[in-house]
């Protein structure tokens, strides 16, 4: 499965890249919204791991741009700033959430839940 990981924190990108590759996935990383948008325009991804807060724009801005591209990857919001209200809002849109910090087991469970 081809996965795009978008996070401004290098350590988070590295961890997700390693963990997801170990599970047999193809992983591409992006350090911000512009980099991610360019990759989303040129490649098809089945899953998008997306941070909410990044220096050059928010994850929700990228989601809005994604809709215009007519691309429909499964989305997992991966952020330390997920409130119960936001979690409910994302759930109603079919978007999964993973609150930082998280454990490997939580990552795997969230990915499986998002794909089912």
Indicate where each model-derived feature is located.
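The feature encodes the CheY-like receiver
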Residues: 13, 55
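Charged docking surfaces used in two-component/phosphorelay signaling
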Residues: 14-22
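Acidic, metal-coordinating helix/loop segments flanking the phosphotransfer/catalytic sites
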Residues: 29-47
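Active-site residues of response regulator receiver
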Residues: 51
């Amino acid at each position: 499965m081809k996965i795009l990981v978008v996070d401004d924190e290098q350590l988070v990108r590295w961890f997700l890249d390693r963990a997801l590759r170990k599970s047999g996935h193809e992983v591409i990383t992006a350090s911000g919204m512009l980099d991610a948008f360019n990759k989303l325009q040129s490649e098809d991804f089945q899953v998008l791991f997306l941070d909410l807060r990044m220096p050059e724009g928010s994850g929700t801005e990228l989601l809005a741009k994604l809709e215009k591209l007519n691309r429909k990857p499964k989305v997992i919001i991966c952020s330390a700033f997920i409130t119960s209200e936001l979690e409910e809002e994302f759930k109603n849109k079919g978007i999964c959430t993973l609150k930082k910090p998280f454990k490997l087991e939580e990552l795997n469970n969230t990915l499986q839940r998002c794909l089912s």
